[in-house]
């Protein structure tokens, strides 16, 4: 049997996100400074395979790439596989949360220092716990996305027994090894978006 990825339509993609920042932490005795900063550059592959009967398999494998310092290859980026069809899309792995997918629409730097998990949560989660934002991308999850109906769609995710979620949110474990749940409802039609 040939592996799925070998037969699937595969796309190689990436994003180079680099900025020149003036940083002033407003700490007494610390001078402001200029720095070249990587704001979430990444490299990845994704693809689909038609399984027939309106059903397709899909996968995505994505890595962080530090464009300024070198190294830092890997990171907590999306790595998942699943099925999609008339029922919607069901995926398993490490993925962006539904919460993040709505907020990400307004953040061109994608989970960087300007809009991160601590900003969204009013400072209740420190950005030092996860450089990508506390609720942006988490492992060990099951995600379901509905089909799109006249611009409306919904998504729900369960994060199951995840060490990363425990590190970020302090062992939440809501019940039966469910660490976090995340949902969204979106409207996206032409130039209009709400979520």
Give, region by region, the residue ranges found by the protein language model:
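Solvent-exposed loop segments that connect transmembrane elements
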Residues: 25-30, 161-178
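Detector for outer-membrane/organellar transmembrane beta-barrel domains
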Residues: 171-172, 176-195
């Amino acid at each position: 049997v040939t592996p799925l990825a070998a037969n699937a339509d595969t796309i190689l993609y990436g994003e180079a996100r680099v900025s020149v920042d003036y940083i002033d932490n407003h700490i007494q005795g610390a001078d402001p400074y200029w720095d070249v900063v990587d704001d979430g550059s990444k490299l990845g592959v994704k693809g689909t395979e038609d399984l027939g009967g309106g059903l397709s398999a899909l996968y995505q494998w994505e890595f962080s790439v530090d464009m300024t310092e070198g190294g830092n290859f890997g990171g907590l980026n999306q790595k998942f596989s699943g099925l999609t069809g008339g029922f919607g899309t069901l995926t398993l792995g490490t993925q962006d949360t539904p919460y993040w997918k709505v907020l990400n629409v307004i953040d061109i730097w994608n989970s960087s220092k300007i809009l991160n998990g601590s900003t969204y949560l009013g400072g209740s989660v420190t950005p030092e716990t996860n450089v990508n934002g506390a609720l942006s991308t988490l492992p060990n999850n099951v995600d379901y996305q509905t089909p799109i109906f006249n611009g409306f769609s919904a998504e729900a995710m369960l994060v199951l027994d995840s060490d990363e979620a425990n590190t970020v949110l302090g062992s939440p474990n809501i019940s039966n090894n469910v660490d976090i749940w995340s949902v969204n409802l979106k409207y996206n039609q032409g130039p209009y978006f709400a979520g």
